[in-house]
Amino acid sequence: MLHLIYISIIVVLIIILISYTRKPKYFRITAPRSVALFHGIHPLKPKNYKTFSEEFETILNNAIEDGDFKGQLTEPCSYALRGGKYIRPIILMEIVRACQLQHSFGAPIYPAEAALAVEYFHVASLIIDDMPSFDNDVKRRNKDTVWARFGVAKAQMSALALTMQGFQNICRQIDWIKEHCPRFPDPNQLGALLCTFVSHSLNSAGSGQLVDTPEKTIPFFKIAFIMGWVLGTGTIEDIGMIERAAHCFGNAFQLADDIKDHDTDTGWNYAKIHGKRKTFDDVAQSLQECKKILHGKKIYTSIWNEIFQKVINVALGT
């Protein structure tokens, strides 16, 4: 009798595996959410920065309410995520939106889960960066840093929880596409490629944190740009050019930050070495190269003027 049960289980598993390889779109990698992340949002409607920021904040609040973080880590993770500029998820969402004006997959893609992922990864890096063993900062965004408020142990676990949940969000995004976008080409394969790319980028960011270089900033913009491009086009074609655009933007962002921190930074700072004037010129040059690439791919939209101006404002201290 026991052998019969084992054989029955094996047969059922074989049937499931065969069905999965033939019809992967019917199988979820993740459990469905109990609440919708967004209501009444038109994925293809042009938006300004303020509107995108408000939309993402709604998505973030709904994700936290739905239990993205559990137990004692709910409060520190939620605390860390509040009050950001959300520039990385906004970039990702806008690239997806702009790409879909040229590509159709049967239904518009709204990349809510992917946008959450890139913000979770970024905020996890900020928590680590503020720790006593790194920058030893007790203030960020005009409030206590996570470790200063909740302790080192909870801060470390929160960074880990944010990173793990980010990968879960990528998988949820792929599941959402499989359910809603019937003409999206091979979402499982692209999802696997995205997870591999993100893992590599996070490794680069971690290495950058250890030596305090721009490589701790640029990888998160690469994640935003490339995930946006892949989800918006359904392909990895021209991904090298998109990565270059991301590098230029991330470099400009880091250099602008170096100008802002010129008088307070105790570690490596490009503006201290090369001077504020030269650094500002490099910011402008990097943004111009990024703009040229985005124009070439027909994804430079009006919101980029706002995004670029925010980088300039950081450099100017306004």
Curated annotation (Swiss-Prot):
The keyword Transmembrane helix applies. Dimethylallyl diphosphate binds at residues 140, 216-217, 254. It is a single-pass membrane protein. Its main location: host cell. Pfam families: polyprenyl_synt. Keywords: Host endoplasmic reticulum, Host membrane, Isoprene biosynthesis, Late protein, Magnesium, Membrane, Metal-binding, Transferase, Transmembrane, Transmembrane helix. Mg(2+) 1 binds at residues 129, 135. One of its GO terms (molecular function) is metal ion binding. Binds 2 Mg(2+) ions per subunit. InterPro entries: Isoprenoid_synthase_dom_sf, Polyprenyl_synt. The chain crosses the membrane at residues 1-21. Mg(2+) 2 binds at residues 129, 135. It catalyses: isopentenyl diphosphate + dimethylallyl diphosphate = (2E)-geranyl diphosphate + diphosphate; isopentenyl diphosphate + (2E)-geranyl diphosphate = (2E,6E)-farnesyl diphosphate + diphosphate; isopentenyl diphosphate + (2E,6E)-farnesyl diphosphate = (2E,6E,10E)-geranylgeranyl diphosphate + diphosphate; isopentenyl diphosphate + (2E,6E,10E)-geranylgeranyl diphosphate = (2E,6E,10E,14E)-geranylfarnesyl diphosphate + diphosphate. Pathway: Isoprenoid biosynthesis; farnesyl diphosphate biosynthesis; farnesyl diphosphate from geranyl diphosphate and isopentenyl diphosphate: step 1/1; Isoprenoid biosynthesis; geranyl diphosphate biosynthesis; geranyl diphosphate from dimethylallyl diphosphate and isopentenyl diphosphate: step 1/1; Isoprenoid biosynthesis; geranylgeranyl diphosphate biosynthesis; geranylgeranyl diphosphate from farnesyl diphosphate and isopentenyl diphosphate: step 1/1. Induction: Expressed in the late phase of the viral replicative cycle. One of its GO terms (cellular component) is host cell membrane. It is found in: Host endoplasmic reticulum; Host membrane. It comes from the Viruses. Signal peptide: none annotated. It is an enzyme of class 2 (transferase). Its EC number is 2.5.1.-, 2.5.1.1, 2.5.1.29, 2.5.1.10. Its cofactor is Mg(2+). GO terms for biological process: farnesyl diphosphate biosynthetic process; geranyl diphosphate biosynthetic process; geranylgeranyl diphosphate biosynthetic process. Belongs to the FPP/GGPP synthase family. Asfivirus trans-prenyltransferase subfamily. Trans-prenyltransferase that catalyzes the sequential condensation of isopentenyl diphosphate (IPP) with different allylic diphosphates, such as dimethylallyl diphosphate (DMAPP), geranyl diphosphate (GPP), farnesyl diphosphate (FPP) and geranylgeranyl diphosphate (GGPP), farnesyl diphosphate being the best allylic substrate. This is Trans-prenyltransferase. It comes from African swine fever virus (isolate Tick/South Africa/Pretoriuskop Pr4/1996) (ASFV).
